Amino acid sequence: MIKALFNKNTALAAVAILALSGGAMAESAKTHKTDMAKKKVSELTCEDFNGLEESFKPTVVGWVVGFNKKGKEEDAVIDVDGIETVTPAIIEACKQEPKASFWKKAEAELKKVF
């Protein structure tokens, strides 16, 4: 278990930087990631989440776990095992409905695990 306090602005910046990093990409992928970096997390779609590197998806899910329903950061113990359990469920839910709100899909799956 890891004790972590997430800062929303720092997390958003990290998501944007990591989403935009990488080697050579097709122009459409660059455009998609640039558009994603401009969105608030509450505006992200499952399609945006699906476009992330597989290895980064648990990090995004962990960040979502670190916020309560009011969008405020919490001083909480992060359940790494829980994140590893719920991440595949969120990935599958987002594959089923790519146009759906990522935040809402993540919250629904998190309620099943936490």
Swiss-Prot record:
Annotated protein name in UniProt: Probable acid stress chaperone HdeA
One of the protein's GO biological processes: cellular stress response to acidic pH
Gene name of this polypeptide: hdeA
Primary localization: periplasm
HAMAP family assigned: HdeA
Signal sequence range: 1-26
Disulfide bond sites: C46-C94
GO CC field: outer membrane-bounded periplasmic space
Keyword annotations from UniProtKB, A to Z: Chaperone, Disulfide bond, Periplasm, Signal
Species of origin: Brucella abortus (strain 2308)
Functional summary from the UniProt entry: Required for optimal acid stress protection. Exhibits a chaperone-like activity only at low pH by suppressing non-specifically the aggregation of denaturated periplasmic proteins. Contributes to acid resistance. Not required for wild-type virulence in the BALB/c mouse model.
Family membership: Belongs to the HdeA family.
Cellular location(s): Periplasm
A Pfam cross-reference name: HdeA
Superkingdom, natural source: Bacteria
